[in-house]
């Protein structure tokens, strides 16, 4: 694919107002792309104002209505686009359904939420297929980049892998374990990604998937996403959610956006790509943060919980020349953003 600025084409980004999608659109616009973003309500000026403030937005950004669960609703957005970045995913939020399950297995999925199986699985799988069906109708399409998650790789029973061998893109999380523990978020990522691979293989669509770990960094949307809220809580001394993390991979939000663009543009990119800067135990993270930000009430240690030890290999992504920001840069940028928005007092 031609990477010259003057020949950048049009691409579509689903779920445009989200944490990752906003950063992806920012980077795409800075790279010279014309971007069509899909949102549920293009008229919601408050929710979308941050997108229109991005450099190049007034000249090269278009926002259109689309809904994951509506067949054909992505047709208009995707038609004429050379590339599609499918980053939209079901919104995790408290459920009024008395049958909703509280996912307390956060050591596996990294998300603490109340949600029913239907609220997460159906939109994730059907939504992905709806987007891909629209891609199939587009003769201009070159490549689709799907945002998956390392929760589609690392949810494994402790005796199911060798902790001394880093997990790589050939690894898949256990569907059976997810169903047994009723952890729907990682299950949705597994099933949606597998459905995407099957559909694209059957229909001749060039697909690449990106699997980020726990994403940290400045938030462009006005409301903090769940991961940013978790980080804010930790920096204020609220440890309940992080107590469950155990061992977790971390990556800068800007790196995740840049990774998506790299695997879209790089002709030889193929298959899955784990996007992760570092993997740390809770106490390793606590020690680092306490030393770097001594004025914040971050706990010096977390409760020791028995968790499977694992590491992640990023050699495939690094072979394309990718370099990750450090854990220190992630938190420096995140904290600066939280201070600027008034969520934290200046350090």
Identify the residue ranges that each predicted region occupies:
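Amphipathic terminal alpha-helices
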Residues: 2-4, 30, 327-347
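Alpha-helical substrate-binding/gating segment
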Residues: 3-4, 231-273
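N-terminal Rossmann NAD(P)H-binding glycine-rich loop of SDR-like oxidoreductase domains
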Residues: 3-35
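NAD(P)H-binding glycine-rich loop region in Rossmannoid oxidoreductase-like domains
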Residues: 22, 41-126, 138
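Active-site "gating" loop of Rossmann-like NAD(P)-dependent oxidoreductase/epimerase domains
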Residues: 108-111, 149-182, 201, 220-221, ...
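Active-site Tyr-X1-5-Lys
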Residues: 137, 177-208
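Glycine/proline-rich active-site loop of Rossmann-fold NAD(P)-dependent oxidoreductases
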Residues: 202-206, 217-231, 263-273
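Mid/C-terminal beta-alpha module of Rossmann-like enzyme folds, strongest
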Residues: 257-307, 311, 334-338, 342-347
């Amino acid at each position: 694919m031609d990477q010259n600025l003057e020949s950048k084409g049009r691409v579509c980004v689903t779920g445009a107002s989200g944490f990752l999608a906003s950063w992806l659109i920012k980077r795409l616009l800075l790279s010279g792309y014309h971007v069509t973003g899909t949102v549920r309500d293009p008229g919601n000026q408050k929710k979308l104002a941050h997108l229109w403030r991005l450099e190049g937005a007034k000249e090269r950004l278009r926002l259109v209505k689309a809904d994951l669960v509506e067949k054909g609703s992505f047709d208009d957005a995707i038609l004429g686009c050379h590339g599609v970045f499918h980053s939209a995913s079901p919104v995790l939020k408290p459920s009024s359904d008395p049958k909703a399950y509280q996912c307390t297995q956060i050591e596996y999925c990294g998300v603490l939420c109340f949600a029913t199986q239907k609220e997460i699985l159906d939109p994730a799988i059907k939504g992905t297929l709806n987007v891909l069906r629209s891609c199939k109708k587009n003769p201009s399409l070159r490549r689709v980049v799907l945002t998956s998650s390392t929760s589609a790789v690392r949810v494994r029973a402790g005796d199911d892998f060798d902790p001394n061998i880093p997990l790589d893109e050939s690894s898949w999380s256990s569907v059976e374990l997810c169903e047994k523990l009723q952890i729907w978020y990682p299950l949705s990522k597994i099933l949606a990604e597998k459905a995407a691979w099957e559909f694209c293989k059957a229909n001749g669509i060039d697909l690449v998937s990106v699997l980020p770990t726990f994403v940290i960094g400045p938030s462009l949307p006005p409301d903090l996403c769940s991961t940013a809220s978790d980080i804010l809580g930790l920096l204020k001394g609220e440890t309940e959610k992080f107590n469950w993390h155990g061992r977790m991979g971390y990556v800068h939000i800007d790196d995740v956006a840049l990774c998506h663009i790299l695997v879209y543009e790089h002709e030889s990119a193929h298959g899955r790509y784990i996007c992760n800067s570092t993997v740390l135990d809770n106490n390793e993270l606590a020690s680092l943060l306490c030393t770097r930000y001594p004025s914040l009430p971050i706990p010096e240690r977390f409760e020791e919980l028995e968790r499977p030890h694992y590491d992640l290999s990023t050699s495939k992504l690094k072979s394309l020349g990718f370099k990750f920001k450090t854990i220190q840069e992630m938190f420096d940028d995140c904290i600066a953003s939280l201070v600027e928005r008034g969520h934290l007092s200046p350090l």
